[in-house]
Curated annotation (Swiss-Prot):
Primary gene name: Smap2
Subcellular compartments: Cytoplasm
Protein name: Stromal membrane-associated protein 2
Organism: Mus musculus
SUPFAM superfamilies: ArfGap/RecO-like zinc finger (SSF57863)
Compositionally biased spans, kind Basic and acidic residues: 252-262
Length: 428
């Protein structure tokens, strides 16, 4: 009888689904792959799709394959699957399978194993009768598998252990409740109302004492006056007591401004001591006494007034060459105000000498009109800048040999004329 009705088909599908939920039927009977969706109903095993193809190659007389979901099942086919299953089938066909045997995973090896198992019956236990095995119920298999769930059904011990814990938890709040009530009453202070009045009187007395203490403290103005009066007036502007005076009086501001001005003047005086200011009329005047050598008898000694040069640093004396007999220049004392106040160190050389082209060159430079060094103290002496630039234009302060020359080294003036001008090569 074929299940043509829809109700029978649904009922058969439900039976197959229940069979697949069994532990042995969750894996392929041949390769042990998970989730078999095919079955050989005459053998009564669930297999995977790869093993189903090999079973079809064995022939219908050995194995008949059907899909669990796609094909229609009959009552006879469902009955065969219920009687066998993967557990009983492996007990029959793999009875003599070695314990160290590894199930193959490659298709040719799997096909050889399936043929040995079902076609050649190489591992089959021939002493067992298939019909008796089919009619045998699965009580033995269920009893062998049931001890595991029975062991899992022992959580009663844990419940007994949890019960005393609950009792202890219930006793804890009961014991803690009377303890929590006592501090609440003490905090409110309802039992001792008299103590509150006493405390209030004590606090009022304490406040009165505090007010008396504040009244006895002197005012900040009086403290500041005492501090200002005790401080010395000649103190520095950045002293600590003045910085601590947080309430200065208006009269002290004028004193502070006067001190600040004095401090500024003292700072400026430091710079003034290094660079003293000279009057314009005394810039080009000669020092107190200046002696000229015998070669220039026309220049007498000039004695300027002491009021002009008084209190100033003595001017440095440099060396100026004096023409001699052999073309060399002899040293001559030169004032600091000479040539517009130029320092004599500007004219200085390592040997204190200067070379010239000819002995008579410096004669014109040294022979200046007597009006420059006038004897009258009140006369304002000024230097003629045009003569200054003309005479200084021919000077070369940095020669090739580190000496000051006029276009020629020392001893080289014999071959040049007296009125020869400077060499143009020196100004390149």
């Amino acid at each position: 009888m074929t299940g043509k009705s829809v109700k029978d088909v649904d009922r058969y599908q439900a039976v197959l689904a229940n069979l697949l939920l069994e532990e042995d039927n969750k894996f392929c009977a041949d390769c042990q792959s998970k989730g078999p969706r095919w079955a050989s109903w005459n053998i009564g095993v669930f297999i995977c799709i790869r093993c189903a193809g090999i079973h079809r190659n064995l022939g219908v007389h050995i194995s008949r394959v059907k899909s669990v979901n796609l094909d229609q099942w009959t009552q006879e086919q469902i009955q065969c699957m219920q009687e066998m299953g993967n557990g009983k089938a492996n007990r029959l066909y793999e009875a003599y399978l070695p314990e160290t045997f590894r199930r193959p995973q490659i298709d040719p090896a799997v096909e050889g194993f399936i043929r040995d198992k079902y076609e050649k019956k190489k591992y089959m236990d021939r002493s067992l009768d298939i019909n008796v095995l089919r009619k045998e119920k699965d009580d033995k298999w269920k009893r062998g598998n049931e001890p595991a769930p029975e062991k899992k059904m022992e959580p009663v011990v844990f419940e007994k252990v949890k019960m005393p814990q609950k009792k202890e938890d219930a006793q804890l709040p009961r014991k803690s409740s009377p303890k929590s009530a006592a501090p609440v009453m003490d905090l409110l202070g309802l039992d001792a109302p008299v103590a509150c009045s006493i405390a209030n009187s004590k606090t009022s007395n304490a406040l009165e004492k505090d007010l008396d203490l504040l009244a006895s403290v002197p005012s900040p103005s009086s403290v500041s006056r005492k501090a200002v009066g005790s401080m010395p007036t000649a103190g520095s502007a950045g002293s600590v007591p003045e910085n601590l005076n947080l309430f200065p009086e208006p009269g002290s501001k004028s004193e502070e401004t006067g001190k600040k001005q004095l401090s500024k003047d003292s700072i400026l005086s430091l710079y003034g001591s290094q660079t003293p200011q000279m009057p314009a009329q005394a810039m080009f005047m000669a020092p107190a006494q200046m002696a000229y050598p015998t070669a220039y008898p026309s220049f007498p000694g000039v004695t300027p007034p002491n009021s002009i040069m008084g209190g100033m640093v003595p001017p440095p004396v440099g060396m100026v060459a004096q023409p001699g007999a052999s073309g060399m220049l002899t040293p001559m004392a030169m004032p600091a105000g000479y040539m517009g106040g130029m320092q004599a160190s500007m004219m200085g050389v390592p040997n204190g000498m200067m070379t010239t082209q000819q002995a008579g060159y410096m004669a014109s430079m040294a022979a200046m009109p007597q009006t420059v060094y006038g004897v009258q103290p009140a006369q304002q002496l000024q230097w003629n800048l045009t003569q200054m630039t003309q005479q200084m234009a021919g000077m070369n302060f940095y020669g090739a040999n580190g000496m000051m020359n006029y276009g020629q080294s020392m001893g080289g003036g014999n071959g040049q004329a007296a009125n020869q001008t400077l060499s143009p090569q020196m100004w390149k």
